[in-house]
Amino acid sequence: MRWKLLILSLLISVALNGQEKGCIPTVPEPPFKAGERIDLGLFYKWGAVNTEVAQAAITLDSLQFNGQDAWHLNFNVKSATFFDVFFKMREDFHSWMTMDGIRPLRFTRNTLEGKYTATNDYNYDWEEMVIHADVNFYNRGMEHYEIPLHPCVYDLPAMIFYLRTMDLSKMKPGDRYPLSFAIDEAVFDIILTYQGAEPLKVRKLGYRNALLFSCSVVSGAMFEGNQELKFWLSDDGAYVPLAIMAPLRVGSVWAWLKDYQP
């Protein structure tokens, strides 16, 4: 499995109850503001092995995008210095989205994973319901795609912050919601399940009240077998990512909150 799929998976999850619901219910005012920063540590765990292999930072600012107020997100991942010797990894994602409704407007991706490189440049066309995507793979060169768009499609950074605008008062444990995210030339469909509230011991930060979600991939071969990702958001109205767990064939990868600056 490529690290890109792991990184994509690490920050995704949420929900359906008997019959399939629509997009996740959201609140009109988001719980975040410009200047926010979230720092995460990525750890590989297998038996007694529990090693930090990368760091991730998510920053948020506001700007004007084609004449409208918009959010700008940057999600950056860098492998630890010692790990660079074995596998150098750099992930740089940027997402522009509307302040009203968290609708994605543009997305860029620049990836280095060992010898593998890739770039994405998306422009969302909500009138024609299509993503105009320019994708450059290390072994294929630049290619253009027209990716079908629907209201529940997001890129990775936009999806993270869209989930944080959920209206928890309209959700209950067991509810499931279909959600889709676009990367490269494809759209991946997932089912997000709200599992409920529980205390969580966060690495080096102690116990926090948390909301648990799980994620099942329903199309796109990101994992072999029926494996579920899990993630925990802070149960304080800000819904900050506290931890994410992605199972692997051997061991698992965890992302733990290290620092949060509102």
PLM regions: where:
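Acidic, serine/threonine-rich low-complexity disordered tracts
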Residues: 20-126, 168-262
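Sec-dependent N-terminal signal peptides
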Residues: 4-14
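Active-site/ligand-binding surface loops and adjacent short beta/alpha elements
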Residues: 126-183
